[in-house]
Amino acid sequence: MVTVRADEIRKIIRERIEQYNREVNTLNTGTVLQVGDGIARINGLDEVMAGELVEFEEGTIGIALNLESKNVGVVLMGDGLMIKEGSSVKATGRIAQIPVGEAYLGRVINAQANPIDGRGKISSSAFRLIESSAPGIISRRSIYEPLQTGLIAIDSMIPIGRGQRELIIGDRQTGKTAVATDTIINQQGQNVICVYVAIGQKASSVAQVVTTLQERGAMEYTIVVAETADSPATLQYLAPYTGAALAEYFMYSERHTLIIYDDLSKQAQAYRQISLLLRRPPGREAYPGDVFYLHSRLLERAAKLSSKLGEGSMTALPIVETQSGDVSAYIPTNVISITDGQIFLSADLFNAGIRPAINVGISVSRVGSAAQIKAMKKVAGKLKLELAQFAELEAFAQFASDLDKTSQNQLARGQRLRELLKQSQSAPLTVAEQIMTIYTGINGYLDSLQLRQVRKFLLELCTYLKTNKPRFQEIISSTKTFTEEAEDLLKEAIRDQTDRFLVKEQA
């Protein structure tokens, strides 16, 4: 007969009691009332938060945007083709966040930070919220460091500083993306991390930008966030915030970043589509009432941080497309009022062969000379005024039959100054090269040359200066000032090269 040992039974029961873990899982769930056009109406989800992520039965993720009395309006981060009416939805208790880190450099990702370049997964342990609040007043400091674009017209007359928001605005096919990509290429060796956000672009256009950056070795320090024209409107709306979160990670790590949004017109259109489908009341041009807030909360995240926070910076170059040069439309006026200046690209200048087609007269940088080195400030001070006077005189000369000698000379000088502002795409110039070019034009050294010879002469002068007067580049790079020694070296080089050039041209 088996003896029952009470102490053993007691021990087993005690162990079982200790192992028992009473867990109560509460889920905030709802059911799908209707789905279509990237929008789902959900019944239930009583405790869902605005902007909270929700998960559908078949795995699609959505964002709760409209919290109404009878149902919740959710925008889908996918096509949602497998979602059925009556299927269950659960709230996740999280808001949208993405992994961030150094591993993203050189990669092409989508708005959910998933790689789309076919080069495998990206491992990262750090996370940032897609939407986070902008730095406050105390967290910032005034902008004082230049961000060189490599384009003479911008660096000399519309200077951009690290931490600035400078709008690039113009009609389609006027070279807006080219200005942005040239700026990225020019950051090589400057210790600046670049983020290029493509919103609603053709996939072929994005591929072309990536190829250009790879060929020039710029992808090493660049992240491309792409949501093409066939992406859901929700992801096109989120892409700029994903880019901003990645740039913020580096900014708060005491690094300098440059972010380009190409372009915010398409983001606004995607947001308008979402809002109209959610039956939000339309306003001007059918955009919802909070479309200004859509862009202001994004662009305010660009900043120059205080010394206490490490002096990191995030410079934003948003791009906005205009229709027939109309800058008084809703989105252009909104973004102009948010940013610290705008670079206006003109279709007329572009078609006249002046590229980059920057209309210097109406372009402005509200940071101004604070974002220029002393050498550039000294040399380029008169350039904008001279070009403005030239434009005025050129308009007058169309109606005048004969001009006096002074006016003719001023016209000739202006034409040469306009010629020296022309640059080939993907050929940014160093600061020393820009100073050399502007100094040569502004002081009349190009007046003796024919207009067609100007670019060839400047190219040869640049090569001659690098080879025979390397001290000039050293002075500009090390002191950031245009010293008497530098000026003497440059004058000497111009004289030598002018003699050689004219002899060669006459031969």
UniProtKB/Swiss-Prot annotation:
Segments traversing the membrane: none
Membrane topology classification: Peripheral membrane protein
Protein's cellular compartments: Plastid membrane
GO MF annotations, alphabetized: ADP binding; ATP binding; proton-transporting ATP synthase activity, rotational mechanism
Cellular component GO terms, alphabetical: plastid membrane; proton-transporting ATP synthase complex
Keyword annotations: ATP synthesis, ATP-binding, CF(1), Hydrogen ion transport, Ion transport, Membrane, Nucleotide-binding, Plastid, Translocase, Transport
Enzyme nomenclature, EC number: 7.1.2.2
Record's catalysed reaction(s): ATP + H2O + 4 H(+)(in) = ADP + phosphate + 5 H(+)(out)
Protein family membership: Belongs to the ATPase alpha/beta chains family.
The protein's assembly and partners: F-type ATPases have 2 components, CF(1) - the catalytic core - and CF(0) - the membrane proton channel. CF(1) has five subunits: alpha(3), beta(3), gamma(1), delta(1), epsilon(1). CF(0) has four main subunits: a, b, b' and c.
PANTHER family referenced in this protein's UniProt entry, alphabetically: ATP SYNTHASE SUBUNIT ALPHA, MITOCHONDRIAL
Function: Produces ATP from ADP in the presence of a proton gradient across the membrane. The alpha chain is a regulatory subunit.
Name of the molecule in the record: ATP synthase subunit alpha, plastid
Species in which this protein is naturally found: Cuscuta exaltata
Gene behind the chain: atpA
